Amino acid sequence: MCIRDSAITDHGLSHYMFGIKRSNLPVLRARIDKLNEEYNEKGLKILMGVEANLLDFNGTVDLDADIMDYLDIVLMGFHYGIKTNNFIEQMKLSLLPQISKPFKKWHEKITERVTDSYIKAIEKYPINIITHPGDKIDVNVVRLAKACKEHGVALEINSSHKNLSVEDLIKIKDIDVDLYVGSDAHKLERVGDVKEALRRANEAQIDIKRIKNIYVE
């Protein structure tokens, strides 16, 4: 069993600390193209992507046509520390899921609104994978998985974050949505470290063939 494809997916432009600079997009594209010349014949494909940021309840994502021209793959997730032109709407998405937690019915409504925002995003943008769904802000993972299956979008099992959790995977086990494992490596030595993601998939008894970036001989 091995990783078949590897994607380099820096955070989207809106992230304060880790967001890729627009000026670096052509530089990264050129480097990845050169690496593929060397490694494609060895069976490894390197993709250039970005982990775009969900910005508000309307499903707005920090992607535009200029960015898309450089990309092979688009990931999208929710993150804190985002700069946006609509600060109030971004803060609603960041804060309401947290402050509603002590109030069950209200939190359930907010969770459905969060789920709606993800679904709106995959309807508006050419997103391939949703990263760590349910991390930081809760989602209805069953509704999200069904929508992702309908739109050909995959979900990530993230080795560095708790989601998708074993419980999440059990809930969506019978929904034939594609899955990917990700290391979320912010350090060089952690690139490709997906042991925790695979452990969760195994515990939830997920068919390994559903994990699209794992090759089983």
PLM feature segments, named:
Residues 1-3:
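Short, small-residue-biased leader/transition segments that mark boundaries at the very start
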Residues 6-8, 74, 130, 155:
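Hydrophobic residues within beta-strands of alpha/beta enzymes
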Residues 10-12, 51-52, 78-79, 133, ...:
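Active-site metal-binding loops of divalent metal-dependent hydrolases
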Residues 11, 177-192:
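Short acidic/histidine-rich active-site segments
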Residues 18-19, 139-145, 163-175, 189-202:
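Histidine/acidic-residue-rich catalytic or RNA/ligand-binding cores of hydrolases
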Residues 152-163:
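His/Asp/Glu-enriched short active-site or ligand-binding loop at hydrolase and phosphoryl-transfer sites
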Residues 17-150, 202-210:
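Extended substrate/RNA-proximal surfaces in nucleic-acid metabolism proteins
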